[in-house]
Amino acid sequence: MTMGDDLWGWQNINGSPYLTCALLAPWPHAFFTRAFYPQLPEQLITYLDPQGKAFRVKQVHGDVTLTATEIGQTPLAPDSTHPPADGIISDAPHQGVWVASADCTPVLIGDLIGKRVAAIHAGWRGTKARIVPKTIDKFLALGSELKDLRVALGPAIAGEVYQVDPWVALEVGQSVQAVQKLATEEQQWDHLSTMVNPPVLPDAEPEKYRLDVRRINQLQLLELGFAQEQIAVAPHCTFQMEELFFSYRRTHTKEVQWSGIVSY
């Protein structure tokens, strides 16, 4: 994964590393690493904006994005102090929006003109359900313009190591409109595995494939009309970079790293 590698840079707080993306330079933001565990957004936001308020949700691998105001108006998830959703959009200054991840893709978005920001949790289920395009639709409904948005797809499990069943690869791939329009599954498989930077890769194990979920999200954005220059894809793999990131696929434990962005 090479596109936009130069847009990503390491920063540190008291020797603990975190990532930032040049596309999101106007906003305080961070893709925090495992070094910050077990700190929660309420603490992490103080590093980005001491005046900021943290907003988070109970992530459920769905396709719902709430505004910060809607978070306070939405019933809580069972056994949680937060409502169920997988995306948050700010609707006032100094709002930090946060997502947790440990292989799924953390997506941070900023609107250069409208000033609003978003954080999205996009695993394979949310990607299949097109949570990122649905969040973009919500930006547009709030008055944003596509050309003003900047999107960073943060550290996640890389396609080269993410083994999945065939039905998962195909159903996630079918969330790309160009794939969905093809008449047969054979044509869809061919498109997904032979296009430039293919999101579906072969696996040494029979009846298994490798799936690049970030690439699927990138393709969804490009189909909406985003320019390549509006999207940055992190060249970091949570599974392979054990010293920096938690990975559920690697350890099957529940530690997470947080990613957040603050409106201004």
Curated annotation (Swiss-Prot):
Q: Which family does it belong to?
A: Belongs to the purine nucleoside phosphorylase YfiH/LACC1 family.
Q: What does this protein do?
A: Purine nucleoside enzyme that catalyzes the phosphorolysis of adenosine and inosine nucleosides, yielding D-ribose 1-phosphate and the respective free bases, adenine and hypoxanthine. Also catalyzes the phosphorolysis of S-methyl-5'-thioadenosine into adenine and S-methyl-5-thio-alpha-D-ribose 1-phosphate. Also has adenosine deaminase activity.
TM region positions: none
UniProt xrefs under PANTHER family: PURINE NUCLEOSIDE PHOSPHORYLASE LACC1, UNCHARACTERIZED PROTEIN YFIH
Keywords in alphabetical order: Copper, Hydrolase, Metal-binding, Oxidoreductase, Transferase, Zinc
Q: Give the matching Gene3D superfamilies.
A: CNF1/YfiH-like putative cysteine hydrolases
Q: How does it assemble?
A: Homodimer.
One GO term in the molecular function aspect is: copper ion binding
Reactions catalysed, semicolon-separated, are: adenosine + phosphate = alpha-D-ribose 1-phosphate + adenine; S-methyl-5'-thioadenosine + phosphate = 5-(methylsulfanyl)-alpha-D-ribose 1-phosphate + adenine; inosine + phosphate = alpha-D-ribose 1-phosphate + hypoxanthine; adenosine + H2O + H(+) = inosine + NH4(+)
Q: Which organism is it from?
A: Synechocystis sp. (strain ATCC 27184 / PCC 6803 / Kazusa)
Specify the protein name. Answer: Purine nucleoside phosphorylase slr1573
Q: Where is the signal peptide?
A: none
Cofactor(s) needed by this chain: Cu(2+); Zn(2+)
User: Which sites bind Zn(2+)?
Assistant: H61, C104, H121
Q: Name one Pfam family in it.
A: Cu-oxidase_4
**The protein's Enzyme Commission number:** 2.4.2.1, 3.5.4.4, 2.4.2.28
